[in-house]
Every structure is written in C-alpha cells, then in structure tokens.
C-alpha cells in the first residue's frame, strides 16, 4: 500500500477511531477480562477507543462538554430494563387499565425526555450517529413477558419517532437479539448477543459514514 493510499484510508469517514456510547446498555454486562474494545470487536481493522458515558454524565455536565474531543462516531444505547423498571408495570397490579396506561405514559414521557437530550448531545457533536432500540427481555413467566413486551413497545415507539425526526439511523435490536443464545439471563445479553449487536452497529456506522443524509433501519 502506498503512503497516499494509507493516508486516504486513515482519513476515511468510515474508520471508527473513537466511539462514544451514550447510555447504560453495557453497565451490567460482563465482557470478561481485558479491554471492552477487544470483547466487542476481537479483530478490528484499525485500533479504536471506546468511551462510555452514562446518561447522568451527559445530562449533568451539559451536552457539548460531555462529549470528549476526538470522537469520530456515536452510538446511543440504553438498557431496556431501566425503562421497564421505571414504568412500574412489573410491580404489583394497577387498579384499572387507565391507571396502568397512565403509569406507562408517565414513565415513557420521562424516558423520552432523557433520550431526546442524549440525541441532542450526539447531533451537536456533528459525527455519524446511530440510535439503538431497547433490547427486549426474555422472562420465563409468559404473563410477565407479555407485559414487558407491551411496555417496551411504547418506549421504542418514542425512540423511533425521535430518531426519525432527527434524521438519525436506527439499529433495531428487537430484530437483532432474537435467539435464546443472545441472552445470559432474562434481562442481560450474553457475550454472543453483545457481539451480534456490535457487529450490526459497526456495519451501520460504516454505512452511514459513507452514505449520510437519510434515516435507515439496520438489523
């Protein structure tokens, strides 16, 4: 490879050199020993760095100040369990359908506000960005599974509407994580599941870096 071609490759917009993950999706997942970068992408085509920013870090520091200098790509991925737990639908029984829907709507409003602020931080950074939908849980109890899936659909609808309005592309994790082997527990992904998500997300970032301008859905 000639020096010029090497320089062109290093400057290519699809080269992920510093990925910032906005969200807590990796917070409770055991990626094993060593660097998270190696667990997510075992054989990368170039050295890269991962910075994870929890939502409070972004919201407390202010949008622009939270994103580190040198970021080349951003992914927004929030733990779906957070949304479900906040809704309160899996704890006890509502007095009526109206009460249940009101509780869910209030939790979805709070979630949407937080998620919108994360998207604003990403768009202000001006780098290729993807938004991930919430990963569905796999509860053993059928009734719990139905309730969780219903609640998750409401939160994911908020994500899809906001991401589309912001012209951000989407990784649809409900279609990516569709096998039992993708899960280490009812609510946490396995190494295989995390690797699958990383592969789809990486492909999405490569694509939108070279072909920006419109919202796409990847799975």
State the predicted function of each range.
Residues 30, 34, 178, 196-197, ...:
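Residues in flexible loops and secondary-structure boundaries
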Residues 20, 29-31, 72, 129, ...:
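Generic detector of intrinsically disordered, low-complexity, polar/charged segments
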Residues 62-191, 195, 199-202:
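Alpha-helical cap/lid subdomain in secreted, periplasmic
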Residues 1-58, 64-69:
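Serine-esterase "nucleophile elbow" of acetyl-processing enzymes
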Residues 2-5, 13-18, 63, 67-72, ...:
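Conserved catalytic region of serine esterases and O-acyltransferases that act on ester linkages
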Residues 38-41, 89, 93, 213-216:
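A sequence-level detector of short, solvent-exposed, charge-rich linear segments
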């Amino acid at each position: 490879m000639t020096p010029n071609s090497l320089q062109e490759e290093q400057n290519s917009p699809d080269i992920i050199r510093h990925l910032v993950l906005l969200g807590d999706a990796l917070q409770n997942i055991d990626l094993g020993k060593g660097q998270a970068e190696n667990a997510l992408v075992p054989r990368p085509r170039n050295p890269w760095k991962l910075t994870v920013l929890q939502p409070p870090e972004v919201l407390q520091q202010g949008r622009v100040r939270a994103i580190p200098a040198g970021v080349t790509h951003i992914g927004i991925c929030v733990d779906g369990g957070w949304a479900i737990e906040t809704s309160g639908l899996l704890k006890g029984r509502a007095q009526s359908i109206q009460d249940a829907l009101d509780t869910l709507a209030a939790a979805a409003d709070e979630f949407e506000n937080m998620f919108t602020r994360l998207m604003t931080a990403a768009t202000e950074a001006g780098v290729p960005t993807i938004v991930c939908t919430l990963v569905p849980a796999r509860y053993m109890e059928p009734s719990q599974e139905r309730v969780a899936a219903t609640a998750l659909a409401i939160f994911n609808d908020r994500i899809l509407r906001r991401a589309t309005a912001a012209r951000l592309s989407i990784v649809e994790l409900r279609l990516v994580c569709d096998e039992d082997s993708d899960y280490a527990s009812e609510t946490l992904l396995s190494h295989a599941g995390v690797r699958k998500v990383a592969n789809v997300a990486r492909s999405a970032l490569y694509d939108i870096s070279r072909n920006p301008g419109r919202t796409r859905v990847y799975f």
